[in-house]
């Protein structure tokens, strides 16, 4: 059960960091494929 909780925390932290990095580098010149988010 502890392993499952650790895996859930890793997945949640991964998605939060992915969202933060996508929000910080949201200028369309660096990643042109993300224009549909605006």
Swiss-Prot record:
What Gene Ontology terms for biological process does this UniProt record contain?
photosynthesis
Q: List the membrane topology term(s).
A: Single-pass membrane protein
Q: Name one GO cellular component term.
A: photosystem II reaction center
* Protein keywords: Membrane, Photosynthesis, Photosystem II, Reaction center, Thylakoid, Transmembrane, Transmembrane helix
List locations, semicolon-separated: Cellular thylakoid membrane
Keyword Transmembrane carried by entry = yes
Q: Where is the signal peptide?
A: none
One family from Pfam that matches here is PsbI
Q: Where are the transmembrane segments?
A: 6-26
Q: What does this protein do?
A: One of the components of the core complex of photosystem II (PSII), required for its stability and/or assembly. PSII is a light-driven water:plastoquinone oxidoreductase that uses light energy to abstract electrons from H(2)O, generating O(2) and a proton gradient subsequently used for ATP formation. It consists of a core antenna complex that captures photons, and an electron transfer chain that converts photonic excitation into a charge separation.
Q: How does it assemble?
A: PSII is composed of 1 copy each of membrane proteins PsbA, PsbB, PsbC, PsbD, PsbE, PsbF, PsbH, PsbI, PsbJ, PsbK, PsbL, PsbM, PsbT, PsbX, PsbY, PsbZ, Psb30/Ycf12, peripheral proteins PsbO, CyanoQ (PsbQ), PsbU, PsbV and a large number of cofactors. It forms dimeric complexes.
Q: Which family does it belong to?
A: Belongs to the PsbI family.
Q: Per its record, how is this protein called by name?
A: Photosystem II reaction center protein I
The species is: Crocosphaera subtropica (strain ATCC 51142 / BH68)
